[in-house]
Amino acid sequence: MKIDLNADLGEGCASDSALLQLVSSANIACGFHAGDAVLMQQCVREALKNGVAIGAHPSFPDRENFGRTAMQLPPETVYAQVLYQIGALAAIVHAQGGELRHVKPHGMLYNQAAKEPPLADAIARAVRDADADLVLVGLAGSELIRAGQHYQLTTRQEVFADRGYQADGSLVPRSQPGALIESEEQALAQTLEMVQHNRVRSLSGEWAHVKAETVCLHGDGAHALDFARRLRAAFAGRNIDVSADLE
C-alpha cells in the first residue's frame, strides 16, 4: 500500500528543511499569500535535494490574511491568477533542472473550490492549460476533484491529519470549535483510519467516506516534526510506503 505525504512550504516556517526529509510532496507558496521569488527558489532547491515532488500552492491575492479570507472573484480572474502562479513556480523549477509535478490551491481558495463549481472549473482549466500532465490536488470528494476529472487531469484526493470533519466529508471551518485536532494521538488514529479504511469519524459521530490518496501535514504546529516522524513510523509498521508515485 502507498500513500503520498504532503506539506505546504515557503510560508515562513522554520521547520521547512527538516519537514522535507519526511514528506514525499511539497506545495510551495507562489507569492500571493506568502513567500516571494527568492524563497520559492530556496524551497525548490531544498525539495530537489531531498527528492521531493514539487507542486505549486496558488492562493487568492491575500497576503494580509494569509489567504484565509473568502473572496468572490470572477472565474476568469481566478483562472488568470492561478495560471500566473503556476507559471512563476514552473519557471523556477525548470531553471534548476526539475519538474513541476502538481498543483494544490491554498487556504480559502482551496475551501471555496471544494464547494463552488465555477471556481473549481476555473482552477482546473488553469492547471490543464499550464500543463495537462500536472496532478490536481483537492479535498477528497470535492467539486475541485470533479472539475479535474472533467478536464481529464490526474487528480489526487487529499485528507488532513489534524483537521475535524463534518458528516458530508467536508472540513470543519476554522472559525468553528473542533476545526483543529490538538491531540497527536487523535490525529494519528484519524489518519490511519482514513488511509487504511477510507473513512473518518465526523464531529457528529457519524462515519464519513473519504478517499485518501495524499495526507496533508501542517508544518506550522509546535510539534509538527515530532508528529511527522510518528506518522512515518506508524506507516512503516503497517507496510504503508510513503511515495509521491502512487501507481
From Swiss-Prot:
GO terms for molecular function: 5-oxoprolinase (ATP-hydrolyzing) activity; ATP binding. Keywords: ATP-binding, Hydrolase, Nucleotide-binding. InterPro entries: Glyco_hydro/deAcase_b/a-brl (IPR011330), LamB/YcsF/PxpA-like (IPR005501). It catalyses: 5-oxo-L-proline + ATP + 2 H2O = L-glutamate + ADP + phosphate + H(+). Forms a complex composed of PxpA, PxpB and PxpC. Belongs to the LamB/PxpA family. PANTHER family: 5-OXOPROLINASE SUBUNIT A, UNCHARACTERIZED PROTEIN YBGL-RELATED. Catalyzes the cleavage of 5-oxoproline to form L-glutamate coupled to the hydrolysis of ATP to ADP and inorganic phosphate. This is 5-oxoprolinase subunit A.
